[in-house]
Every structure is written in C-alpha cells, then in structure tokens.
Amino acid sequence: MTAPTTDAAPAAGAPLLQVDAIDVFYGDVQVLYGLSFEVREGEIVTLLGSNGAGKTTTLRAISGLRPPRSGDVRFRGRSLRDVPASRRVELGIALVPEGRELWPQLSVRENLELGAYGARARAGAARNLERVLALFPRLAERRRQLAGSLSGGEQQMCASGRALMSEPTLLMLDEPSLGLAPVVVEQVMSVVAELHRGGTTVLLVEQNLRQALAIADRGTVIETGRVRLEGPSAALSANPEIRAAYLGL
C-alpha cells in the first residue's frame, strides 16, 4: 500500500510516533501512568504484557478513541492533542481493533470500502481495493459474501484490509491472532511481515509473544499501565524475566 503524502516525512532518525508520558483514565480509574515509548519509521514494534496491562488502551489513546488526560502523542513531530480520531486516520494512523468490529450485514467488499472514507483515501479507493484483494486472495473469492458469515481468520483479514484502505503510514493491530487456529496465526503474521516489507510501519499488540517477537524489531513490555522493559526483540526473547513470565520457559 502507498504511504500518505499529505504531511512531510519525519527527519532522518526521528521517530514516526512518540508517546510521551501519557496518563489515561476510564472515568476515575487510571489505566496508563506516564507511559512513554516511540516507534521509528519502517519498524515493527510490539507491545507486550498480560491482560489488563494497558496495551489496548495505549492503541486507543494513539488513535484518538481514548485521549490522554495528560502527556502527549506526536505523529511526524506533530502533537495530536487536539486532533480528532477521524483526522488521525487521514494523517496516516489506522487501527485494526481487537474483535475486528466488522459490519456483519454488509458484504466483504462493502466493509473494505468503508475504510476509504477520507478524501485522499476515496480518491485511491479502486486502486487500493485491488491491492487489498491481491494481498488477501480469500477476500477476493468472498467479496460478495456477508462479513458476518466469514470464519474468524477471514474476518481478521477483512478488518486488516479495511484499515489498509486508508493507506496508513502506521498500522496498529490489536490481538490479530486472538481465537485463531495456529495455521491461521502463521498466515496473519506472514501478512504483517509482508506489509512491513512494503514500507508500512507496524505497532502490534499480540498474545502470541513468540510470533510477535519473531517478526518485530523491538518490543515494549507494559505492566499495570507503565513501561517495565523495552529493547530489541532478540534481547527480550533472551531475557529470563520475559521467558519466565510470558514465554513459559
């Protein structure tokens, strides 16, 4: 997929995404505490942690669905503090949510086309639809089928394809392998790696830590809403704490 061209690229060596000391609440309940990390252009970065650690909330904060109460999120050096979620998509940030959140009564093609709702994405919708269907041949076979009748793996493909219709620079995936058979998980991770090779920067939340660390450049471990560890994937895979707590070794 082509990357958005509406904003200047970050300077060489500069982060594409900066999450800077964000505090996020649900009502009076604080979920993230001064959380900070960055993603550089061209990377796959994975967020690791147990259920309830704050990984999904982090993605929602970046996408604008759960704005931080304090701290800041910057994309290409620009603060997103006053940028609504819809505008963030146009800037190049796309989220594939946990649970896929498709429109089950609409066809596969209609679900995909709904991902191209921004002005720039609408202009390239036909071209991007062809690319998505080439990336996911199963969707091409089922383009007229209702999304609600798809298998779990096919629904994940459809949700990912819908996000790609917006031509994201940063693609965020929340638990893409959740509930899928191992062979389908391998297919999903293969597609993520292929997107990365095509130039898409990826921020991945994934329950299958072995698979995530195998394709990611770096990882950030979140515990109770705070960054616990971060570093290259190889170093995290070899870390005794990570191996014991998350890999069962």
Where are these regions (language model features)?
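Conserved catalytic motifs of ABC-family nucleotide-binding domains
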Residues: E167
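The feature captures the beta-strand-to-loop junction immediately N-terminal to the Walker
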Residues: L48-S50
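Conserved ABC ATPase signature
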Residues: L146-L150, E154
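ABC-type ATPase nucleotide-binding domains, specifically the catalytic core motifs of the NBD
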Residues: G27, V83, V108-R127, L135-A140, ...
